[in-house]
């Protein structure tokens, strides 16, 4: 191989790597969501769908919803992201917890104490009961459920801030009732999903 050919190959390789890097950067551009009243914010990949308070319905499409109608904000993976797998949906959500009669909890203990009327159920994790997010300590709970061959797993995080009870959640649904069975996420896909949701969760912060 002469020097001219070698130089040409190096140039082609460099251009290809630069193009791939540029595509990767654009695919992972970051957007910031700020609550209408400015009380909180978080960051998320711009390719994900985000729905805000009062306009949550477009983010509710899976058999078991991963966004609640009363959410303050909800971010979901696009359906095509993991096509042809058994993943139903994945989301990060922010809610304000209210008790029966739309009465807010009046203190931190009431905010994080499991309540029979909670939907989803909030059961404090024995293995990992607390998580620091945005400099604030949240109580960590879990919830799961099944419905007609579909299942959901949720990690819930609650904190009492400025006289309001906030709940952050990361939810994943999947199905196992198809014939033939759909494939599960590959290890790289699972890692991508886990890291993305964790990054969104830990980007959350209160504005005051």
Residue positions per predicted region:
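Short structural boundary motif marking the start of a folded domain
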Residues: 29-31, 164
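Bacterial N-terminal signal peptides
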Residues: 7-16
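Short, compositionally biased
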Residues: 6, 21-22, 48
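Short, well-structured beta-strand
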Residues: 119-208
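Short, ordered beta-strand-loop transition motifs
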Residues: 25, 53-57, 128-136
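Bacterial N-terminal signal peptides that target proteins for export
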Residues: 1-7
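Boundary at the C-terminal end of the N-terminal hydrophobic targeting segment
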Residues: 18-23, 27
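Secretory pathway targeting signatures of secreted, lumenal, and periplasmic proteins
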Residues: 32-116, 147-152
